[in-house]
Structure formats: C-alpha cells, structure tokens
Amino acid sequence: MALLDLAQEGMALFGFVLFVVLWLMHFMSIIYTRLHLNKKATDKQPYSKLPGVSLLKPLKGVDPNLINNLETFFELDYPKYEVLLCVQDHDDPAIEVCKKLLGKYPNVDARLFIGGKKVGINPKINNLMPAYEVAKYDLIWICDSGIRVIPDTLTDMVNQMTERVGLVHGLPYVADRQGFAATLEQVYFGTSHPRSYISANVTGFKCVTGMSCLMRKDVLDQAGGLIAFAQYIAEDYFMAKAIADRGWKFSMSTQVAMQNSGSYSISQFQSRMIRWTKLRINMLPATIICEPISECFVASLIIGWAAHHVFRWDIMVFFMCHCLAWFIFDYIQLRGVQGGTLCFSKLDYAVAWFIRESMTIYIFLSALWDPTISWRAGRYRLRCGGTAEEILDV
C-alpha cells in the first residue's frame, strides 16, 4: 500500500512538473513570436558588402504553385547570389519550368543541374550534389521547392549570420490557401509546431528543419560536405548537429519559411506527420515518451489527474478548462506567427484545432507500428540513430 501511495505521489509530482514545462513552452513561444517574428532585421553591414550566397534548390515534379514559388527567388533584392536548380530525373516536368524561368531572367546568375549524383540513400542529397560541388560562394542556402519568399528574405537571413553564427533557419509556416486541408496545415504550423520549435531553440536545443537553411559552406566541408549526410533521411537534423558540434551558434530568421505547395490534402498532411514522427523516434528515442504527453488532450488528462489527486478537483472539469486555455493560447500563437489577419474564421480554427489534436495519438501509434517510410518515390527502412536503408522492389 505504501508503495502504491508513493507511486501516486510521484505521478502527481510528474503531472505538476509537466504543467510547468508545457506552459513555459507556451509563454516562451508566444513572447518570442511577438518580439522577433515578422520584424525587419537590423542591417549588420552595408548592402553592397553583403556576402555572396549560393542557393541550392532541389526540385521533383510540378504542382500548380511551383513556377510562382520559384520565380520569387529570381526576384530577390540581393547584390550577389546564384540560383542552382537541381532536378534528378531527365523526364521531370520541372525541367521545363526551370528553363522557362532561366529564359525569362537572363540577368540572374542561375543554372540547371539534371541527373544528380548517387552518393547515398538520401534522394535530396543525391539531387543536390552536383550543384554543391560547384557552388562558388561561402554561404549555402538550401531551400525546398514549395517555399516562396519576398524580395528581402535573403537579406534578412544574411543579417542574422553574425560572427559566431553558423546556421540561420526559418520557422516553417504555411501561406494562405483555399480549403480545409490548408486551414489544418496552417493551424498545425502556427500552434503546436512553433511551440516546440521556438521553445527548443530558445532553451538551447538545436531544433532545425531543412525547408530554408543558410549555412557556412566551410563548416559543412569540415564535417565532410553534403556527402557525409547522405546516409540519413533527416539530413537537416544531422547537418545542424554537425555545425553545433563545431561550436557554432544558430539564429532564426525574422521571416518564416513560407510553404506554398499547390498540392495538399488532409491525407497528405497526415502522411507527412507520420513520416516526421518516425524520423524523430529513430533519431531521438526519448520522443516515444515526450511527444504524446506534450499534446493537449493527453497532457490535460495527466495534469487533471494530478490536480484531482492533490486538490480533489474534478478531473473532467479541469480537463475541459485546461483544454480551453490551451485552445486560446494556441490562437494567440497562431495570430503571432501569421503576423496579420487570418484567412479563415474562428469557427474554422476551432474545428481544425480539434481535428488536429484528435489526430495526434493515431499519428504517433501509426509511426510506431511501421518503421518504414515513403519519400520522394522511394521506400526506406529506418534504423536506430537516424540512418536508413532503401527498400528495393524485387
């Protein structure tokens, strides 16, 4: 009996610690968003003396927004940069899109690389290798095909690249688009994702996604260059780790990494979340414990039980009140990341928020059930530590 009581006291203590940690994350991310995001960065050096940047753009396939997204990179207001467009397959329709833009912007230093170079199992690295090997500037900007920018995006990122900074990254977010699937994505990338992403970076944990990353090429070369990360599927995590291990700091751009894919659906979003969860579980096994208890409904039940055990409060009343507070703070977070008026109603937000929160356990269990992932037309079996092997169809 004494052992059971001790276990219950321990669980109650855990519940209160969880409460403090999660709400610190809420406050940290909201305050950081208000103070840092969507602000004009201070110019650290004269415009004419900004260092050159090599933009590496991995492309595969075409969606309705691809040409408009790509065109924003040809219209950057930056004194010295090159655009290196990378397409793996010779019959990829993205090649025609690239050629059209190369013809439209002859004054932009841009080249097209077709065929890639097989150096490992990561298809993105394989696609980028030829461009990386001939990149002529000291700063490398790897940016996904679905990202769109505004004219001063690169200037903002380079201004964050101060003396001891080795990597500048953008907080992933989603552009305003039509349909409920777009709303669901926007709610996730404006609430749950920035709460974890920002609070991790504020407290010193290196949390980086590779959607838009500006890095020092010499530091990457010291780590073995891009080829050193071809054995991983989550190459962005391991590149960031290699840079941090060499004593360099990270900085976050004041502008978000604006995803604007023209192809999206609820099933695509769900598959993406499952794939990301599988990668996190294999890279960071502690995710198995930490991730489920950091989500609203599970956390509210644990904390509600702790409050009932200590204060005899009604669990369901506490659960509902805690979820309501979470819901409100998430809306504040979302408005901060958006930096303006949302394109959907509060009712749309409420429905999308509830569905997203309800999906979390299914996503997590699905990730545990099957250790293989499908990505860029390939299938891979993940191994502990983040490496993977390609599954070849016989």
UniProtKB/Swiss-Prot annotation:
What catalytic reaction does the record list? an N-acylsphing-4-enine + UDP-alpha-D-glucose = a beta-D-glucosyl-(1<->1')-N-acylsphing-4-enine + UDP + H(+); UDP-alpha-D-xylose + an N-acylsphing-4-enine = a beta-D-xylosyl-(1<->1')-N-acylsphing-4-enine + UDP + H(+); N-(9Z-octadecenoyl)-sphing-4-enine + UDP-alpha-D-xylose = beta-D-xylosyl-(1<->1')-N-(9Z-octadecenoyl)-sphing-4-enine + UDP + H(+)
Motif (D2) on chain: 144
What topology in the membrane does the UniProt record assign?
Answer: Multi-pass membrane protein
* The keyword Disulfide bond belongs to this UniProt entry's keyword annotation: no
Query: According to UniProt, where does the site described as May play an important role in binding to the inhibitors DEPC and PDMP lie?
Result: H193
Give the record's GO biological process terms: cell differentiation; cornified envelope assembly; establishment of skin barrier; glucosylceramide biosynthetic process; intestinal lipid absorption; keratinocyte differentiation; leptin-mediated signaling pathway; neuron development
Parts of the chain on the Cytoplasmic side: 33-195, 305-309, 370-394
Mutating H193R leads to what result? Abolishes activity
Documented effect of changing H308A: Inhibits activity to about 35%
Does the record's keyword annotation contain Cell inner membrane?
A: no
Transmembrane stretches in the record are 11-32, 196-215, 288-304, 310-328, 349-369
Q: Where is this motif: (Q/R)XXRW?
A: 272-276
Known outcome of mutating H322N? Inhibits activity to about 50%
Q: Indicate which residues form the motif D3.
A: 236
Cellular component per GO, a single term? membrane
The record gives the effect of mutating G179A as:
In strain: Wistar
Name the reported effect of H90A.
No effect on activity
Q: Which Pfam families match?
A: Glyco_transf_21
Q: EC no.?
A: 2.4.1.80
Q: Which pathway or pathways does this protein act in?
A: Lipid metabolism; sphingolipid metabolism
Q: Which family does it belong to?
A: Belongs to the glycosyltransferase 2 family.
On subunit structure and binding partners, the annotation says: Interacts with RTN1; regulates the ceramide glucosyltransferase activity of UGCG.
Query: What protein does this entry describe?
Result: Ceramide glucosyltransferase
**Organism the protein comes from:** Rattus norvegicus
